[in-house]
Amino acid sequence: MSANYIEVQIFGQVLRLHCPAEQQENLRASAQRLEERVALLKDQSGIIQLEKVLAIVALNLNYELEQEKQKNADNKTVLESCIHQLDSSLNKLATTGSIAINQENI
């Protein structure tokens, strides 16, 4: 098999996928996690139709992705605010030689 392709087995089917060598381990782990999530949902819900289970798992994964995107956006906003405060304090220090420390943010 070419170094740019990987075979993974998902739900009893072998898929041959293009994948850079440095990402193959992550792809295998992702396939394993997908199988685990599908099996768990089947057990919990009693749904046996693979297409329905896959659709629900896909929706759940997308929801989780959107939550993580929002967390990242929130973290970015907080970090940008901290950078702005630090920049302002450094500018004030360079100009006046002293700064007042806001104890609430420490």
Curated annotation (Swiss-Prot):
Domain of life: Bacteria
Compartments it resides in: Cytoplasm
Subunit structure: Homodimer. Interacts with FtsZ.
Predominant location: cytoplasm
Biological role stated in the UniProt entry: Activator of cell division through the inhibition of FtsZ GTPase activity, therefore promoting FtsZ assembly into bundles of protofilaments necessary for the formation of the division Z ring. It is recruited early at mid-cell but it is not essential for cell division.
Gene3D superfamilies in alphabetical order: Cell division protein ZapA protomer, N-terminal domain
Coiled-coil residue spans: 21-80
The species this protein was found in: Haemophilus ducreyi (strain 35000HP / ATCC 700724)
Keywords recorded for this protein, A-Z: Cell cycle, Cell division, Coiled coil, Cytoplasm, Septation
Record's protein name: Cell division protein ZapA
Family in the record: Belongs to the ZapA family. Type 1 subfamily.
A biological process from GO: FtsZ-dependent cytokinesis
Pfam families cross-referenced by the UniProt entry: ZapA
Entry annotated with the keyword Coiled coil: yes
Taxonomic lineage: Bacteria, Pseudomonadati, Pseudomonadota, Gammaproteobacteria, Pasteurellales
Gene Ontology CC: cell division site; cell septum; cytosol
